[in-house]
Amino acid sequence: MAESGVEILCVGTELLLGDILNGNSRWIAEQLAGLGLPHYRQTVVGDNKERLISAVREARQRCRVLVTTGGLGPTPDDLTTEALAAAFDTPLEERPELWLEIQQKLSAGGRPVAPSNRSQAFLPRGAEVLPNPKGSAPGMIWSPRPDFTILTFPGVPSEMRAMWTETAAPWLQANAGTSGVFVSRQLRFSGIGESDLAERVADLLASTNPTVAPYASLGDVKLRLTACAPTADAAAELLLPVEAELRRRTGNHCYGVDADSLASVVIDLLKQRHQTMAVAESCTGGGLAAALTAVPGSSSVFQGGVVAYSNAVKQALLGVSLDLLTAHGAVSQPVVEAMARAARERLNCDWAIAVSGIAGPGGGSAEKPVGLVHLALAGPGGCEAWVQHFGERRGREAIQRMSVIRGLDRLRLCLLAQV
């Protein structure tokens, strides 16, 4: 007997080989949690009919609902519908009204109608069409067995999401026996490691409703809080006291929630204080400016930046003296201090972050190894500088990313400390 619950089956050799990031499974998992549907397994299968059939038959033994993405196009390697029908010895039938709709959609979009498109109008006997409002590839809702239902979606994320929202989610709510509504909230932390954070909140990690789970990524640690209740409002209420206690224990290490980034938080703090900022970058190559300008509305507080990669540009655009560069080198505290002060003055702003380091893989020495980064922050109260040792094992991209994070976080803390 199959368990109650949902499995996700993503189809496509491009997913299996890692050529395309599988964002569909993550999004669907979030939607299932919001519907209160238990979800225990995700599978990726390449464009191979026999392996698809095997994966579907195995899922049949474990779950009551199988959600598939991919393999619904008109090309020879789009095998999902054919494999599903074969898995349950069910013939495919052409749906004339569906074929007409496919032709109309293609023509309306200025695309030619190829003979191969007709294959998309074939569904297993007894299947219900799952309409695609954004594309030509229809999905289906099909129950080949009384206690087992399959929902199929194309792999294109925008099409899949529209189909889910308009048709699949209401169907699942009405037919899949939800156990409650799950609500999640993610707290984001900086300047604290995963193990240190876990020690501070060890007792809360053992709670069951809400659950608290740590996740770590480069320069960022997260705690995901998840609660289940009959309604979304009731689940959200369960989260409130736990979130308050987590914030109390971690202080300013907690910089935001959910989609917040350090850059977006810094932008908001600057707006609240009617202040502006700029950057002067060397080893990050514009990474600081890119992070800030990725935030909508950043133009009201971000004046601009200088990517001074060479010593000549440091001299010409930031006025760093040749004597300073000769005496200390580009990767040094005196130079980043001069860069930060110059950026603040020349771009006429309240704050300026400067960074210069050795991101590698070459260019390091015993005195200044790969991973050494000097940063400075010039502000209304003066200029402070500090050094980070990220180590050469992290790699160039990680060193650059960590430098951006450390610079933004120092500015965040200084803004919070303002009276």
UniProtKB/Swiss-Prot annotation:
InterPro entries: CinA, CinA-like_C, CinA_C, CinA_KH, Competence-induced_CinA, MoaB/Mog-like_dom_sf, MoaB/Mog_dom
Gene3D superfamilies listed in its UniProt record: 3.30.70.2860, CinA-like (3.90.950.20), MoaB/Mog-like domain (3.40.980.10)
Family matches, as Pfam families: CinA (PF02464), CinA_KH (PF18146), MoCF_biosynth (PF00994)
NCBIfam families: cinA_nterm, PncC_domain, PRK00549.1
Similarity comment text for this entry: Belongs to the CinA family.
Name this protein carries in UniProt: CinA-like protein
Organism: Synechococcus sp. (strain CC9605)
